[in-house]
Amino acid sequence: METVQPKPVHQNPVYGSYFADPYIWKSGGIYYAIGTGELEARGEVRGKIFPVLQSEDFLHWTLGDSALVRPEESLGAHFWAPEVVPHGDRFFLYYSVGHGDKNHQLRVAISDSPLGPYHDTGKSLLDPERCPFAIDAHPFQDDDGQWYLFYARDFLDVTPQARAGTALMVARMKSMTELEDEGRVVMRAQHDWQRFQANRSMYGKVWDWHTLEGPFVRKHEGRYYCFYSGGRWENDTYGVDYCVAESVLGPYLDEGNEAGPRVLRTVPGQVIGPGHNSIVTEPDGETDYLVYHAWDREMKARQMFIDRLVWTPEGPRCEGPTWGSAFNART
């Protein structure tokens, strides 16, 4: 009688050390994950930047070398939210760099290997004079091969439909290292749960500041779903929601989220501030997984989590967050 072997399982967090803004891709049969490490988040980088994990089975992750050769120090020491995409025979790393939470620029670095080293191209994707704060670059390739860059930037105008704060944008890419223009708005904050901080001092004034950030786009059944994180990344208000469009450039709608994030939110006492997600369809080529970070219970480290993403009649929902529990990785 043949012995049936149990399927391998994940157990969250899948990597125990600090690993925020996680992004996973596959190259040459190997899974890679890149994220914001503790030194990058604290602005205390030494040597190369952005930790990279590797896995052969999507279950067990080991730390390798960091990916990015540090660009000129005048750009700052806080490096956030890396994403890597292969194109042709090279790999393109998108990230932001700045001084604390000020003057962040979107940059691109290139390598011949998924592990790096990645070397910065020497220029920003956006004009820092016109756009003094831009973060969370997410390149997306549509079915026709055209690339677009989703990202987050600040807005100071206030209308009945839009609050001051960080919002989502999309721009058509001229090449892997150039944008055609600054693009257009995807979504502005509209709801109380998206508040980052009341009475926040920014740009010489005090604002009721709201935040949408961490865009990630998945096309599903002909529609474009732009996932994003809203609220404050440092507490339990943070969570994942989405907006939907019939065209990659919009208009995007997010009706039905007035009460809070629908995809992923805090579970008090267990998982705090889950967010900044990416999505990967692995390892069976059919099952979608939401890759995200969440705080440990002591609020000392953001760690990498993976849970299944399901598409329901009401929209995408995460089968989580889970903590310390195991589930089958479908192979």
Where are each of the predicted segments found?
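Carbohydrate-active catalytic/glycan-binding domains of CAZyme proteins
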Residues: 1-331
